[in-house]
Structure formats: structure tokens, C-alpha cells
Regions:
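Accessory, often C-terminal, charged low-complexity segments
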Residues: 1-197
């Protein structure tokens, strides 16, 4: 009964975690009620650190936020249907810049498949990004970022890649790679409420 109440009756409450608000992980805030009053205040939440803690990630590398810009063009793609026969492409290359509209932060580490057994590890890559609201551009930038920063598969055999927001990363998996993609929002919710995801 309590789980039902939390999942449905409090949906959209500013004092509970809003999974739909992960578009900009750097600006996430919770509205907190002061005990014994009707007064509320906003508190910034570090979603990156909170997520690492929730999934039990042993962090091996925590990158800084990096900004990127790019120009776009459309090219005809005969594999697409007639009504949408163009595909969005980069016009040039991905450019790293401090004030870039697209921002990424990667975290590398591992979780323990069996609690306490440090020999039974699941190697994880967590990709946080600031979304602009344009799904096609956001996903193209993620794809290009992933291609640019992918290391040799032998060096980076991740078991799981977590990423916030809708994405098409599974389409980039190469034949020798076996990683799976999980949405941060789903994994966050599952870890918080201990429910099957």
C-alpha cells in the first residue's frame, strides 16, 4: 500500500525526487519543507554522487563536466522512409569548448555483483549529459561523443553503460562488445525504491 501511495499519489511532488527532471543534472533541486512549519526551501542535489552511492559504484575515474558544440547538416539517406529521407549529421567535428551547449561527464568504476566479493565485479561507465530538448541533436551529440572517446574495447570492457535520457547507444555496440545500456533514471528509481526495473 505504501509503495502504491509513493508511486502514484505523490507523483509530481516537488519534495520528492523527480526522475523526469534529469535533463540537467547540474541544476537539480529538491523543495524541502522545514520541520514544524509550512515554509519550504530549495536544496541543490548532486545527482552524480547520489547515483554513484545508490548503485554502490566504486569510482575509479571521475571526469569533469566537458562542453561541446557542433554544426549540423542534413543528408539524404536512402534507407529511411520517403517522408523522412534525411538524417541529421555533424557538419565538421565535435568541438570541445567550456561553454558548449552539450555537456558530458563520465564516471568509470565497478559495482559488486555479489556484495562483499571484490572478485565478482561489473565494470560500469556512467555518462551524464545536459539535454537541450532536441532529441535528435542530443542523441547525435551523444553518439559522436561516444565514438570520439571510446577506447580500445580490450581496455574498456564495460559490462554496463548508464546514460541519462533517451538514447540509441545500443546501435553503436561493435561485434566484439557485450555491454548493455541502462537508463540512469530507471536505475535511480530502482535503487531508491528497491523495485524491479
Amino acid at each position: 500500500m505504501l509503495r502504491y501511495w509513493l508511486n502514484f499519489e505523490t507523483k509530481g511532488s516537488p519534495s520528492l525526487l523527480n526522475i523526469e527532471g534529469f535533463d540537467d543534472p547540474t541544476a537539480y533541486k529538491l523543495k524541502i519543507k522545514k520541520p514544524g512549519t509550512d515554509e519550504h526551501f530549495e536544496k541543490a542535489v548532486d545527482l552524480v554522487e547520489t547515483f554513484n552511492w545508490l548503485i554502490g559504484l566504486h569510482v575509479e575515474h571521475l571526469d569533469r563536466w566537458r562542453g561541446y558544440d557542433a554544426a549540423f547538416k542534413r543528408e539524404v539517406d536512402p534507407e529511411l522512409p520517403e517522408d523522412t529521407n534525411t538524417r541529421l549529421m555533424l557538419d565538421g567535428t565535435l568541438k570541445e569548448t567550456d561553454n558548449g551547449a552539450w555537456r558530458f561527464r563520465k564516471v568509470e568504476g565497478y559495482t559488486l555483483r555479489t556484495p562483499g566479493d571484490h572478485n565478482d565485479r561489473e565494470k560500469a561507465l556512467v555518462v551524464w549529459r545536459k539535454l537541450t530538448g532536441d532529441l535528435e541533436q542530443d542523441n547525435l551529440m551523444l553518439d559522436e561523443w561516444f565514438r570520439k572517446y571510446r577506447l580500445s574495447p580490450r581496455e574498456t570492457e564495460f559490462d554496463v553503460i548508464y546514460v541519462n535520457g533517451s538514447n540509441n547507444l545500443p546501435n553503436l555496440r561493435q561485434a566484439e562488445e557485450t555491454w548493455k545500456v541502462r537508463l540512469i533514471e530507471e536505475a535511480f528509481h530502482q535503487a531508491m525504491w528497491d523495485v524491479e526495473g
